[in-house]
């Protein structure tokens, strides 16, 4: 732990301590890989008093990327599943995130230092005017290196892992459907 680590950590903790302000919402963003795994033999369904049984053999169907954000003080969530994780997908997600906060002056975005997590991604994928306009919607707060645990979206990823990412899901379409169902149902019920 050095001075830069402590400085970034304290900046994030200061941000989390701020009261709710719709003009300056605090939103935590990250992405994670998801592996698409199918069954080679159909699982044996559950019976009363018995657990479902699945064969140890499985089929690899590639991977995809889950991009997600959460506003910790309200529980508002946004999620997208993409075939890959590049500057293009980051830009698409940030455009959607900005649309979710039309009244915000600036979205205070907590994220890690990944090479795609900066405004240059916008300029590589949008016109200069659109990129500038999108960049003005955000104020970036970077977690210290090796400190993703400071980003509250990690808690959401843990919850998603327990709900649906802890089992075999064979296609990107099915994964997206399941994740968006959970995100939308949590939003309606106020579950966190």
Q: Model regions: which residues?
A:
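Electropositive, glycine- and tryptophan-enriched low-complexity nucleic-acid-binding patches
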Residues: 47-105
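Charge-mixed, compositionally biased segments that are often intrinsically disordered regulatory tracts
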Residues: 1-59
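Acidic/histidine-rich, metal-coordinating catalytic segments
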Residues: 105-118
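Short coil/turn segments at beta-strand junctions that form active-site/ligand-binding loops
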Residues: 23-24, 104-106
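Mobile genetic element proteins and their domesticated derivatives, centered on retroelements
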Residues: 28-30, 69, 75, 94, ...
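RNase H-like polynucleotidyl transferase catalytic core
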Residues: 53-58, 130-152, 168-171
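C-terminal anion-handling pockets and recognition modules
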Residues: 146, 154-192
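Short, aromatic/basic amphipathic alpha-helical patches
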Residues: 120-131
């Amino acid at each position: 732990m050095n001075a830069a680590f402590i400085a970034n950590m304290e900046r994030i903790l200061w941000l989390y301590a701020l009261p709710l302000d719709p003009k300056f919402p605090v939103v935590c963003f990250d992405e994670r890989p998801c592996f698409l795994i199918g069954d080679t033999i159909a699982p044996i369904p559950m019976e009363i008093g018995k657990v479902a049984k699945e064969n140890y053999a499985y089929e690899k169907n590639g991977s995809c990327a889950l991009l997600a954000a959460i506003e910790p003080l309200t529980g508002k969530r946004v999620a997208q599943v993409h075939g890959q994780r590049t500057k293009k997908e980051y830009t698409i997600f940030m455009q959607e995130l900005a649309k979710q906060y039309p009244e915000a002056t600036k979205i205070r975005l907590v994220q890690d230092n990944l090479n795609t997590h900066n405004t240059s991604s916008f300029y590589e994928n949008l016109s200069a005017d659109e990129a500038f306009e999108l960049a003005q919607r955000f104020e970036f707060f970077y977690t210290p290196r090796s400190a993703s645990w400071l980003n509250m979206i990690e808690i959401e990823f843990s919850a998603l892992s327990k709900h649906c990412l802890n089992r075999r899901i064979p296609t990107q379409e099915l994964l997206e459907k399941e994740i968006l169902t959970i995100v939308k149902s949590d939003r309606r019920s106020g579950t966190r």
